[in-house]
């Protein structure tokens, strides 16, 4: 049997996936079944755009359900170590860029719960890979997509 990819995530991220799955199964799936039923009542299915759209939507919902069930089955919940001196998944990290002093704050989460617009970056991102395992006050080199790198200093690490 081949090894399944594990999905590291916070407890909060795991619970959000469970909620999303529940909504897909109890709300979205029944809604699309009803849309298909209504579209069928229009008659000829060969030229029924409502029916085609509802069937497409059903396919997307079923794919989402399978994807989320897979992630839940293979979730690796990262427990907070309580150590706010070392960066790990689940921690919120504040750092300043050296030498300009620009401050940035990110929570490092598993890829399944990453949301850069809300300050949650994937543990697989270059910046998170550079920070994980480092300590408060460490200076770290972070590679940039253009091949350059920046130097940052970790100024705060906190639990969620």
Curated annotation (Swiss-Prot):
The keyword Transcription regulation applies. One of its GO terms (biological process) is DNA-templated transcription elongation. Keywords: Coiled coil, DNA-binding, Transcription, Transcription regulation. Gene3D superfamilies: Transcription elongation factor, GreA/GreB, C-terminal domain (3.10.50.30), Transcription elongation factor, GreA/GreB, N-terminal domain (1.10.287.180). PROSITE patterns: GREAB_1 (PS00829), GREAB_2 (PS00830). Pfam families: GreA_GreB, GreA_GreB_N. GO terms for molecular function: DNA binding; RNA polymerase binding. InterPro entries: GreA/GreB_C_sf, TF_GreA/GreB_CS, Tscrpt_elong_fac_GreA, Tscrpt_elong_fac_GreA/B, Tscrpt_elong_fac_GreA/B_C, Tscrpt_elong_fac_GreA/B_fam, Tscrpt_elong_fac_GreA/B_N, Tscrpt_elong_fac_GreA/B_N_sf. It comes from the Bacteria. Residues 4-70 form a coiled coil. Belongs to the GreA/GreB family. NCBIfam families: greA, PRK00226.1-2, PRK00226.1-4. Necessary for efficient RNA polymerase transcription elongation past template-encoded arresting sites. The arresting sites in DNA have the property of trapping a certain fraction of elongating RNA polymerases that pass through, resulting in locked ternary complexes. Cleavage of the nascent transcript by cleavage factors such as GreA or GreB allows the resumption of elongation from the new 3'terminus. GreA releases sequences of 2 to 3 nucleotides. This is Transcription elongation factor GreA.
């Amino acid at each position: 049997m081949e090894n399944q990819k594990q999905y590291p995530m916070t407890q909060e991220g795991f619970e959000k996936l469970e909620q999303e799955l529940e909504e897909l199964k109890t709300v979205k799936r029944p809604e699309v079944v009803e849309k298909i039923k209504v579209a069928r009542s229009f008659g000829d299915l060969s030229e029924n755009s409502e029916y085609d759209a509802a069937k497409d939507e059903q396919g997307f919902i079923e794919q989402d359900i399978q994807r989320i069930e897979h992630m839940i089955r293979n979730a690796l919940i990262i427990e907070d170590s309580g150590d706010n001196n070392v960066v790990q998944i689940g921690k919120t990290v504040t750092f300043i860029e050296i030498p300009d002093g620009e401050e940035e704050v990110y929570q490092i989460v598993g890829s399944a719960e990453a949301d850069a617009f809300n300050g949650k970056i994937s543990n697989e991102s270059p910046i998170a890979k550079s920070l994980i395992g480092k300590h408060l006050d460490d200076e770290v080199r972070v590679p940039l997509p253009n091949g350059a790198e920046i130097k940052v200093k970790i100024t705060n690490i906190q639990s969620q």
